């Protein structure tokens, strides 16, 4: 059903991008109704406007808190054109019908993020704008609602193609967008008022990105969010559901490291990681940790990729490479494979909470942001680790924190030697790690072990000592801690307890 735009109400906080739309509407003979600063802006472009006050016969009140909250405005928006009683009341009360509403809301979230005072934040809670958006969206059969700058381009395309005429499906599209904007806005306000109490959960995302499929080809997949806030994709195919999971795991892991570090991940677990003075050294030693699992993996570095490192990386088949930058020559090399995904990370990603849908609800927890240092490592055995061994324990504990439980990490000299992850038995996780280390020719004498949770029995201590490992880190907290400590003392193993468990499921 086609509708003609004859009168537009325009009240916006941001004026950018509005001039082109105004020019097209004016060309079609559309009358402009506006408020305050928006009216001044429109008139500065040479277009006449009707002030909202001329329709309401009331001035802007209460310091601008009340402008459009009036039957003369809301009635002109909500009146149903095909409804006989509505049209009789339009004539009776002398209402001016409004066919298009362009409005954006006060920048509430930006004001909160700026650290503004509570008084300033309260004043950025939009009342009139929300009412205009909801009213116009409710009456989408007759009215077009443009609720944000993000919708200007779509409206401009319609005006250029068809003039001041819109179709029902277009108006319904804008109405859906309007309720997305209003619900997101109200959720942001609720979260601010709720603070840290978490009395209810309101999650919103302004963008939905369809994926090729979900975790498996028979599952549908969608990403809700805006990846462009953090990444620029420089090359490669579209990101998949599994890519995104590995990217999340990779980014959260690498952010715990300060020295030049390279990590390789498969199925959310690190299969290679090393910190070195140069990035190419870090890459070579990360790959050496498990060159078989690295095939088809997700790679991440915390330093820009140079030409020399790119030449080495190019020898490996991989899905994704993430780095804070790429030298031009490095990009030329890495772009040789058309499907290889290259992501430039623009800024760190810090989340306070993580969420998982479960049992018809949502399970939420604070993100695990604990990073143990040597100061938190309490020696509980007769033999104490050396400073070098303590340094390696910190490295290993950072990795075990990001590994699926039950998890054991073996490390030496800032290099991941092997890991056992996702095991139902902790001793099996250690057996897996020892076997992998031997398979790739690593000498475990001088290596350290970090466990994501306590040892329920002393069997892991015995097995580690038999393999040549003489330094262990674990959280402690088992009723049998004394057994593990006694076994360590008997075998000459140094053990520290961190007091922090790192389960990850």
Where are these regions (language model features)?
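Active-site/ligand-binding-proximal alpha/beta "capping" segment
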Residues: 81-137, 378-387
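Glycine-rich nucleotide/cofactor/substrate-binding loop typically near the N-terminus or early
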Residues: 37-108, 200
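N-terminal glycine-/serine-/threonine-rich phosphate-binding loop
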Residues: 1-55
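C-terminal binding/interaction regions
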Residues: 318-341, 463-503
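Glycine- and Gly-Pro-enriched alpha-helical subdomains that act as flexible
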Residues: 271-291, 409, 413-461
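Active-site loops and adjacent core secondary-structure elements that bind or stabilize anionic groups
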Residues: 150-367, 389-398, 405-407
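Cysteine/selenocysteine-centered motifs that mediate thiol-based redox chemistry or coordinate metal-sulfur cofactors
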Residues: 299-300, 306-315, 440-481
